C-alpha cells in the first residue's frame, strides 16, 4: 500500500508541475506551437536519463524513491498522449509544418535529452566515486 501512495504522490506532483509549466509556456511563447508539451517531454527525458545513470543505474537501495520519481512524477509530468493529440490537431487544421515539426522535435530532442541526462549522470557518478 505504501508503494501505491508514493506513486500517487509523485504522480500528483508531476501532473501539477506539468500543468503549471504548460500554462507558463503559453503565457511566454503563445499557443501557435505546442511548446509546453515539448518542454515537459524534453525535461522529463533529461531527468529520467540523468536519474537512471546517476542514482538508479544499478540495484538501487532506494526503490521507493525510484518508483516515486520515475513512474510517479515523471510518468505524470511527461505526456505522450497530449503530444499525439496536439500533432493530430495540427494535421486536422492543415498545419502540416507544425505537425511534422512537433513529431521531429519531440522524438529527436527527447532522445537527445535522455542521452545528455544519462551522460551527465554517468559523469557525476564517476566523479563522486559511487
UniProtKB/Swiss-Prot annotation:
Residues that bind Na(+): 75, 78
Major subcellular location class: membrane
Record keywords: Cell membrane, Ion channel, Ion transport, Membrane, Metal-binding, Sodium, Transmembrane, Transmembrane helix, Transport
An example molecular function term from Gene Ontology annotations: fluoride channel activity
Catalytic activity annotation: fluoride(in) = fluoride(out)
Cellular component terms (Gene Ontology): plasma membrane
Subcellular location, record wording: Cell membrane
Gene Ontology BP annotations: cellular detoxification of fluoride
Domain of life of the organism encoding this protein: Bacteria
TM regions (residue ranges): 1-21, 36-56, 65-85, 103-123
Coiled-coil spans in chain: none
UniProt key word Calcium: no
Function per UniProt: Fluoride-specific ion channel. Important for reducing fluoride concentration in the cell, thus reducing its toxicity.
Protein name: Fluoride-specific ion channel FluC
Gene: fluC
Amino acid at each position: 500500500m505504501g508503494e501505491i501512495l508514493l506513486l500517487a504522490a509523485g504522480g500528483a506532483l508531476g501532473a501539477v508541475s506539468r500543468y503549471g509549466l504548460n500554462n507558463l509556456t503559453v503565457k511566454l511563447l503563445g499557443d501557435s506551437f505546442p511548446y509546453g508539451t515539448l518542454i515537459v517531454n524534453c525535461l522529463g527525458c533529461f531527468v529520467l536519463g540523468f536519474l537512471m545513470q546517476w542514482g538508479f543505474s544499478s540495484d538501487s537501495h532506494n526503490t521507493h524513491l525510484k518508483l516515486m520519481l520515475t513512474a510517479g512524477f515523471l510518468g505524470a509530468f511527461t505526456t505522450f498522449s497530449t503530444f499525439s493529440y496536439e500533432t493530430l490537431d495540427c494535421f486536422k487544421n492543415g498545419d502540416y509544418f507544425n505537425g511534422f515539426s512537433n513529431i521531429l522535435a519531440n522524438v529527436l530532442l527527447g532522445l537527445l535529452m535522455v542521452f545528455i541526462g544519462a551522460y551527465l549522470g554517468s559523469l557525476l557518478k564517476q566523479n563522486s566515486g559511487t
